[in-house]
């Protein structure tokens, strides 16, 4: 098998290899294999690397087009995780040196503390059908995940990086921007994938900021933000009534605005105010 792989990778391009279906993209896993090495290298180069971590986890490596460039980096140690058993066996033959750093499993169920003793970074051409779940797992483990560079549907990437006041700004924008600096790096056309997705994709970078905990009740913050955007056309006086009775609200200016008009700092201040009103 090893000699066969050496022959294949020395003779054929990525596009030809994928067409030969060594690893078949599976619709139920949301797989769209990147075929452009130039873009793959650009994604890996977007991982800044800092003295805060020396380990990187790639999610959904497929046939290893990103992994090839990751393994050339000497500033960190690379781990791979793929839920697809076919990809796992392919990668196990391609990168025998990885050993137990190649994981056949579900990223969403992965216990980070069991694998990484210290902080680390995440990178990947992420399955589009679980994009939001991946981002919320990163949020839940923000004490561990220092940096993330990832490919998402363009619409999801825009929502992550959207500023307040824009139509893309929403729940995901606020939660991520509360703890991370978000950068929209570049757009990727459908033709660079096999099979090509129906929409454009985009690469974003998350860099954790200095905020460890918000200066408010974080559980209430999440409730207020969700309530605000679940009825984004209404003023917060109406939307936040899902969290607290209207008769407890005062004439604070935030109650007369819509959720999309508030920055993260505004939502923190609103949460503090709501908390005081609820306790009164």
Kindly give the residue locations of the regions a language model identified.
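C-terminal lobe and adjacent flexible extensions of AdoMet/dcAdoMet transferase-like proteins
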Residues: 208, 227-280
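Catalytic cores of RNA-modifying enzymes
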Residues: 4-227, 265-272, 280
């Amino acid at each position: 098998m090893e000699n066969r792989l050496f022959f294949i990778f020395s003779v054929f391009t990525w596009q030809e290899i994928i067409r030969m279906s060594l690893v078949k993209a599976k619709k139920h896993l949301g797989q769209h294999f990147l075929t452009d090495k130039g873009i793959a290298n650009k994604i890996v180069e977007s991982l800044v690397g800092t003295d805060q971590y020396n380990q990187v986890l790639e999610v959904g490596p497929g046939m290893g087009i990103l992994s090839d460039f990751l393994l050339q980096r000497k500033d960190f140690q690379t781990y791979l995780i793929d839920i697809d058993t076919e990809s796992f066996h392919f990668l196990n033959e391609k990168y025998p040196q990885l050993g137990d750093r190649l994981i056949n499993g579900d990223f969403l169920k992965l216990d980070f503390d069991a694998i990484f003793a210290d902080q680390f970074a995440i990178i990947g051409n992420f399955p589009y059908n679980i994009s939001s779940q991946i981002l919320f797992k990163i949020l839940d483990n923000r004490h561990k995940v220092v940096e993330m560079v990832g490919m998402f549907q363009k619409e999801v990437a825009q929502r992550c990086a959207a500023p307040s006041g824009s139509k893309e700004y929403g729940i995901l924008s606020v939660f991520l921007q509360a703890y991370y600096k978000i950068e929209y790096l570049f757009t990727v056309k459908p033709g660079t994938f096999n099979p090509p997705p129906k929409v454009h994709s985009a690469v974003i970078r998350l860099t954790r900021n200095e905020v460890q905990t918000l200066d408010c009740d974080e559980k209430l913050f999440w409730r207020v933000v969700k309530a605000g955007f679940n009825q984004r056309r209404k003023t917060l006086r109406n939307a936040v009534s899902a969290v607290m009775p209207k008769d407890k609200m005062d004439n604070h200016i935030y109650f007369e605005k819509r959720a999309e008009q508030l920055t993260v700092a505004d939502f923190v201040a609103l949460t503090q105010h709501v908390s005081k009103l609820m306790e009164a």
